[in-house]
Design a protein with these regions (language model features):
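Conserved alpha/beta-hydrolase
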Residues: 67, 74-100
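Short alpha-helix in the alpha/beta-hydrolase fold that links the catalytic acid
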Residues: 262, 276-285
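An N-terminal hydrophobic leader/cap segment in hydrolases
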Residues: 1-32, 36-46, 350-351
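Short beta-strand/loop motif that positions the catalytic acidic residue
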Residues: 260, 266-268
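Alpha/beta-hydrolase-fold enzymes
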Residues: 144-230
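Acidic catalytic loop of the alpha/beta-hydrolase fold
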Residues: 271-275
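Catalytic active-site module of serine/aspartate enzymes centered on a nucleophile-bearing elbow/loop
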Residues: 291, 296-351
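Alpha/beta-hydrolase active-site loop
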Residues: 105-125
Length: 351
């Protein structure tokens, strides 16, 4: 298949029994910054709560996460009458990887990710009905916030799940981590694993590694990962860590936060061991129309949490939806059974 045909072909959406792609969706390739092949998927609701779709929810996953991990919440949005556009960031999912070793979670520069996101919006603007609601988790939430700070005006509201505005560094001080990052980048080790820790995702267990308290959702995602190992991403590189620190610092500038004019809800896990909840609360207070909601007992991956905790996130989404696209009847409707999973693709080549 030549390069033009590869972009024209539909991108696969993977699945396993019980966790297949919601109906009404099509996976597609698009070109990111530098011509990189990236994957996105667009869904139209099969049942409406109004005479037409209420708008579009644009979903941005966190580090390591592909579109497939968000099937359940995509189904929730569809049941509420929204179109959904979800995407794989560069370096993860079925988007092009940045290093020959596909398991390395790598990044080069914040600007590449922001450019990719702008190209995503441009590519689907004609098809994605407005108003648009931005939904981003962790790394995705930070990049979403930076997009708004950069002047993006096509969104009517945003709901961010535990955004990665300031990462936790364990027993190491932030100062020592930044020093280690600078040293490794200076010595050409940007593509090496942080502390040589590959963090093989296939060795993870619920007891040791889960970022949710819901074991059934965790195991369902594990089944998806084993069915399509090309989706897997391991530990971060020094380059990714430099990117994460840079994105967090830039997103937290008070002047930048004040420029965001749309309503933004930050929904934060109380038991988060990946990001500082205090920082996210601080940021919410400095947004022009920010709201901070903390979920007691929740771990980092709120959208994968137990039903009662997920319900808090969905309530915040519904409140945002009612504000930007009010309808008389907001009762969710059932999503029809999903189709059978598609076959596994060949892995994409590294850029």
């Amino acid at each position: 298949m030549n390069r033009a045909a590869a972009y024209a072909a539909n991108a696969p959406l993977m699945g396993v029994p019980g966790a297949s792609a919601p109906p009404g969706g099509i996976g597609e390739w698009f070109r990111g910054a530098g011509g990189l092949r990236l994957r996105a998927a667009f869904w139209t609701p099969s049942t409406l709560v109004a005479k037409k779709p209420r708008g579009t929810v644009i979903v941005s996953p966190g580090r390591t996460e592909p579109i497939e991990k968000y099937y359940e919440v995509i189904g929730n949005f569809l049941a509420r009458g929204w179109c959904v556009l979800a995407h794989d960031w560069r370096g993860q999912g079925l988007s092009a990887r940045l290093l020959p070793d596909r398991l390395k979670g790598h990044a080069r520069a914040v600007e590449e990710f922001l450019d990719d996101y702008a190209r995503l919006l441009d590519a689907w603007e004609a098809r994605a009905p407005k108003p648009w609601i931005m939904v981003g988790h962790s790394m995705g939430g930070t990049l979403n916030l930076m997009t708004l700070e950069g002047g993006e005006s096509r969104f009517a509201g945003a709901v961010l799940s535990s955004p990665m505005l300031r990462i936790k560094t364990g027993k190491r001080s932030m100062w020592s981590v930044k020093l280690a990052v600078r040293w490794n980048l200076r010595h050409g080790k940007a593509g090496d694993y942080v502390l040589d820790d590959a963090d093989d995702p296939f060795d993870h267990t619920f007891e040791k590694d889960a970022l949710t308290s819901d074991e059934s959702r965790y195991e369902q995602w594990r089944q998806q990962l084993y069915a399509c190992p090309h989706l897997a991403v391991g530990g971060p590189t020094w380059g990714w860590l430099a990117f994460a620190l840079d994105a967090g610092e830039r997103s937290l500038k008070p002047k930048a936060l004040k420029t965001v004019r749309i309503p933004v809800a930050i929904v934060q896990a109380a038991e988060d061991d990946r990001v500082w909840k205090q920082t996210n609360k601080w940021a919410a207070k400095r947004l022009g129309r920010g709201r901070y909601v903390e979920i007691p007992g929740a771990k980092h991956e709120i959208i994968m949490e137990a039903d009662d905790m997920r319900a808090v996130f969905l309530e915040e989404f519904d409140a945002m939806g009612a504000y930007v696209s009010p309808v008389e009847d907001l009762s969710p409707v059932a999503v029809p059974p999903a189709p059978e999973p598609v076959s596994q693709p060949e892995p994409d080549e590294a850029a």
